[in-house]
């Protein structure tokens, strides 16, 4: 098992650039879960993670890469699509007793893919009813499929929540390495940050308490050298693709890569 997770750590870091500490925290937690999975029954998902940090630093990519490397199906649910009062129906479905009843996107996916990764992207944008559904998954590991009227089990799922909450931490230049910020400080920032539109906290206290008992990872800012490396890798892939399709041979002056960083 140890060798498996060492290889997983290496392969994920090759794809998710500049986030070694966050990757390490996630891998260690998954390793611990696998070691302890035979010690008794547990409620809730197999593992859950809250990834916090600035936009565009690889939070969603980290979750996606974990699923690809573990070779399990995954689904990414953008919570901005679940910001209205009745949007939760898209997740759990509507009763087939009514005309137009249909199965929910989330429960259908988990019913068909018991071992899977679920990414709730930008969780702070979710409507309150959606948050309550997520609480039920975290606490009980089940969700009622409104269409089939049967419970769907989430016990073998790995759940990632991503969030851009925590601006007081990642906008503070004194915090050089975000991934080293102690968990209690991160939790306090999550609990106290308010939605500028409603002037209410982004997260209800109930979900904060539940997330605090799980795995919380602060994801680091993207350093200039890492950004440059990502740009170079993407350009190499693009050039290779053009060469295979059209036979083009392209050479780029190294200084040109730096220009892309400011576009």
Where are these regions (language model features)?
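AAA+ P-loop NTPase nucleotide-binding core of proteostasis motors
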Residues: 1-263
């Amino acid at each position: 098992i140890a060798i498996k997770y060492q290889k997983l750590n290496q392969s994920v870091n090759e794809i998710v650039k500049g986030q070694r500490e966050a990757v390490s925290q996630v891998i260690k937690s998954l390793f611990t879960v696998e070691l302890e999975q035979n010690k008794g029954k547990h409620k809730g998902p197999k593992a859950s993670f809250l990834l916090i940090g600035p936009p565009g630093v690889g939070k969603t990519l980290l979750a996606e890469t974990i699923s690809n490397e573990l070779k399990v199906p995954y689904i990414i649910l953008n919570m901005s699509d679940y910001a209205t009062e009745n949007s939760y129906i898209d997740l759990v479905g509507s009763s087939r007793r009514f005309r137009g009843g249909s199965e929910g996107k989330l429960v259908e996916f988990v019913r068909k893919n018991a071992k899977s990764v679920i990414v709730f992207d930008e969780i702070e944008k979710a409507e309150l009813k959606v948050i309550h559904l997520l609480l039920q998954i975290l606490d009980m590991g089940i969700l009622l499929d409104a269409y089939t009227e049967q419970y769907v089990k989430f016990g073998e799922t790995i759940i990632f929540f991503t969030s851009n909450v925590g601006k007081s931490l990642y906008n503070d230049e004194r915090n050089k390495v975000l991934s080293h910020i102690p968990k209690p400080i991160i939790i306090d920032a999550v609990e106290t940050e308010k939605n500028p539109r409603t002037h209410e906290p982004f997260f209800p206290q109930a979900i904060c308490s539940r997330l605090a008992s799980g795995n919380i990872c602060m994801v680091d800012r993207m350093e200039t050298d890492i950004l440059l490396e990502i740009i170079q890798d993407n350009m190499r892939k693009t050039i290779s693709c053009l060469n295979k399709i059209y036979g083009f041979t392209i050479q780029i002056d190294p200084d040109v890569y730096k220009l892309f960083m400011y576009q």
